[in-house]
Amino acid sequence: MEHFDVAIIGLGPAGSALARKLAGKMQVIALDKKHQHGTEGFSKPCGGLLAPDAQRSFIRDGLTLPVDVIANPQIFSVKTVDVAASLTRNYQRSYININRHAFDLWMKSLIPASVEVYHDSLCRKIWREDDKWHVIFRADGWEQHITARYLVGADGANSMVRRHLYPDHQIRKYVAIQQWFAEKHPVPFYSCIFDNAITDCYSWSISKDGYFIFGGAYPMKDGQTRFTALKEKMSAFQFQFGKAVKSEKCTVLFPSRWQDFVCGKDNAFLIGEAAGFISASSLEGISYALDSAEILRSVLLKLPEKLNTAYRRATRKLRLKLFGKIVKSRCLTAPALRKWIMRSGVAHIPQLKDYPTRFTSPTSRM
């Protein structure tokens, strides 16, 4: 039975970043359900926007994005829509439009060969015994059993590691549903849509490489029905759909209290969305995935006496920032407050009157 210093479950942005940073310094094994190349197998449903905090992380690491990861076009504003109030506003944003699956595969490709990576693999069972973490996984057509001193859960919203460590922990979840359509809009755009009759979270759209992606986060019970209902409403705002080319769905976490951020215990650690590190106001998680990976790298290499305590303390600033996003989310999803903010015109950039496409409701007050 092979033994490692660190076993990482999941190679999204968090797991890939950590594996890359620990390579050559610790003996690392990493398991991921995505394939190494191509579009077959699992891909993460995501709007695919790289926030400024994530961009800063790449600056610190001296990394630049390859052209095949960057999507077309690059959009400089978010069109915010309040459906019930028939209001539309434009707010400046500095996101980079990316192909999320290509981005994930690129992140994996940066992991040095010294890390033992198993692609298209499935983690079957984990447990702790004799001060070691035991992992049984299936890869290359057969089951393998390894042990590790430290276990890292970077396995997202449905984290197996989080469920093992905190079997009674409950965090609010939504089903994220996305559909892809051939782009019909004369001018591409990115939008954020609020409609409390549909969801107490939010919906979105993004133009990407000739496609129009429309999605949102909805209650688990009847998400598909609500998604369809919102699509019908958006015709009043000049959204154009047609026949869906592709449909995607996944679970997304929605932290709503301080206790929703869990860091791990017993030499097991959680990073990225597995730890609840995702913005409640935008559902953006890549920047927090990268930040938590860097924090854990620093803790593991310093090897303090109590690693879990050290990691919890080191993530306090990150958790406080995310708690602020919970407060912001409550403001954005409160109909009266949101309507007042949007009507105030604060930070709104109006489009020129002779602009050919405005994507507003006929009753919208600009």
Swiss-Prot record:
<protein>
    <recommendedName>
        <fullName>Protein CbrA</fullName>
    </recommendedName>
</protein>
<dbReference type="InterPro" id="IPR036188">
    <property type="entry name" value="FAD/NAD-bd_sf"/>
</dbReference>
<comment type="similarity">
    <text>Belongs to the CbrA family.</text>
</comment>
<dbReference type="InterPro" id="IPR002938">
    <property type="entry name" value="FAD-bd"/>
</dbReference>
<dbReference type="Pfam" id="PF01494">
    <property type="entry name" value="FAD_binding_3"/>
</dbReference>
<dbReference type="InterPro" id="IPR050407">
    <property type="entry name" value="Geranylgeranyl_reductase"/>
</dbReference>
<dbReference type="GO" id="GO:0071949">
    <property type="term" value="F:FAD binding"/>
</dbReference>
